[in-house]
Amino acid sequence: MENIGKIPLKDEWRNRWAIIKQFILNPVREMAFLQDQFQVSELYTNIAKRDPHLHDPNFPQWLNFGYWKEETTYNGACAALARKLAEVAELKAGDHLLDVGFGFAEQDLLWVRENNVSSIIGLNTTELQVEIAQERVAKAGLSDRIKLQVGSATQIPFPENSFDKLTALECAFHFDTREDFFAEAFRVLQPGGRLAVADCLPRVGREINFWLRVNSKKMCIPFPNQYDRHTYVEKLKKHGFVNIQALSISEYVWPAMVHYFAQISQGISKHDLVIDLQKDNPGLEAWSRNRGWFMAFDDYLLFSAEKPKLN
């Protein structure tokens, strides 16, 4: 189902006024922020440091919006999203996988246990996440199959034709740029190899304008990455990929996030909140009119693409 990108004018201007007020009240801070370079690693380091359970393997450290079609808990929904991406990637025994932007590697642990992936190499630019993820992998006894290191998805430190599969679970919108990542992914995949990406982007019809630029900056999203699903597919084609598929899962992500942020604002831990879209579904528009506007994305898709096989 195609999403409609425009929101009611009164909501649009309410949101714009909220940004304008920030510039009026804190002009020096806001201008300085907009002039800074992208600090994705700093953003996620600060988020991690606020978590009291960071070193406790009994508390999963998922960092995605989740797939809430049947799940009602945050950790369950995040695991469901990882499983959905595994389906799209067609992960199986024998695969040698590169996972970029792996967060705390929860999905890598799941894919080894449930999909029996032979080996996973993970790249992540946030050093604290790499350190904690290595610790969690070691405690799980899987350090021989999951190797994690600091590294960039736009400058992958491996030779061409190195991997059967390549995954990016809800991180590619941060890459500077996503197109550079596409080029690198194509290079390091073996002929016939498969790329699978869970990604957030503007809905079809949303204006790519000044307001989106400001919100993108606040979310550490390089503005060249802000394009809709149709342009996304064209860019994959441009970099040589074939058999491209795009599966929208917005209806099972964003409505749940309306509830998520409402409960978090009440002081409920993400490990304790309960969301049941079967009983209370606010719909996609509830997200797009509010947080989706400020967070600079309101479409969610799973993309898959293949590097052509050799003749």
Language model regions located:
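Class I SAM-dependent transferase core
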Residues: 41-88
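Class I SAM-dependent methyltransferase SAM/SAH-binding core
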Residues: 98-155
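Short, glycine-/aromatic-enriched active-site segment of Class I SAM-dependent methyltransferases
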Residues: 200-223
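Short alpha-helix
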Residues: 224-240
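Conserved Class I S-adenosyl-L-methionine
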Residues: 245-311
